[in-house]
Amino acid sequence: MEKISKVILSNMCLIYDNNGHILVIERTKNDWPGINLPGGHVEENETIDEAVVREIKEETGLTIKNPKLCAIKEWPWGENLRYLGLLYKCNEFEGEIKSSDEGKVFRIKRSDLNKYKLSQDLDELISLIENAKL
């Protein structure tokens, strides 16, 4: 008998400007330590694009426009469960950057990324986003 895996949809967004900066979050919870890209889960009855806009607003205070889906990353998570990470990028945004209960949000130079303690797979995720053929 085949087992069907439960799938949890999540998103992350590489928010960048034209001066070489990216937006990162240092999460409060220790389940994924290190800096990461902002994002979160897709909720019931919302599209994947609605979810990334909502999550970015909740975590960073910014309203993003025209996020581009660049890649999908899969993480097996125990028996019969997997996460699908929907990886976006966006350079159209408005509002003031503010941290949330999720963690401290701040801008860094993209070229300085490896000076920070990175969360698991962050290098790979950013590479997937930056190398996407859109």
Segments the model singles out, each with a brief description of its role:
Residues 73-96, 129:
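Active-site-adjacent beta-strand/loop module that shapes the phosphate/pyrophosphate-binding cleft
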Residues 11-13, 69, 88-90:
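A structural signal for short, well-ordered beta-strand segments
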Residues 89, 98-129:
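NUDIX/MutT-family hydrolases
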Residues 15-16, 24, 90-92, 107:
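Conserved hydrophobic "DFG−1" position in protein kinase catalytic cores
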Residues 1-22, 38:
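Conserved N-terminal beta-strand and adjoining loop/helix that marks the start
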Residues 63-71:
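A short coil-to-beta-strand element that immediately follows conserved catalytic motifs
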Residues 21-58:
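Conserved Nudix-box catalytic region and its N-terminal flanking loop in Nudix hydrolases
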Residues 8, 37, 64, 81-85:
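Short connector loops at helix/strand junctions that flank enzyme active sites
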